[in-house]
């Protein structure tokens, strides 16, 4: 899963570079992704996730345990994904 947020599902989108002369060339807009280790107290281990900045805020709001159960229910998290 390259360049996809594991929490929000954000992925690259396409658009245009626009020059001062209004010339347009195609480009990709990438999400603001970071790899991060979270300590999961219930499993007594670290879990590595690839997250966007919005994914971090969702984990701050809901908690890592709830977010992990949602990711596993969607089938997007493998134990050796990173």
UniProtKB/Swiss-Prot annotation:
Question: InterPro entries, alphabetically?
Answer: Ribosomal_bL28 (IPR026569), Ribosomal_bL28/bL31-like_sf (IPR034704), Ribosomal_bL28_bact-type (IPR001383), Ribosomal_bL28_sf (IPR037147)
State the source organism's domain of life. Bacteria
Q: Name one matching Pfam family.
A: Ribosomal_L28
Q: What are the GO BP annotations of this UniProt entry?
A: translation
Official protein name in the record: Large ribosomal subunit protein bL28
Q: Name one GO molecular function term.
A: structural constituent of ribosome
In the record, the note on similarity to other proteins reads: Belongs to the bacterial ribosomal protein bL28 family.
């Amino acid at each position: 899963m390259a360049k996809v947020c594991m929490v929000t599902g954000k992925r690259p989108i396409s658009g245009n570079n626009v020059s001062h002369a209004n010339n347009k060339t195609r480009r990709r807009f990438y999400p603001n992704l970071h790899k991060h280790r979270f300590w999961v107290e219930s499993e007594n281990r670290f879990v590595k996730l690839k997250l966007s900045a919005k994914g971090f805020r969702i984990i701050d709001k809901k908690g890592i345990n709830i977010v992990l159960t949602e990711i596993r229910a969607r089938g997007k998290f493998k134990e050796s994904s990173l």
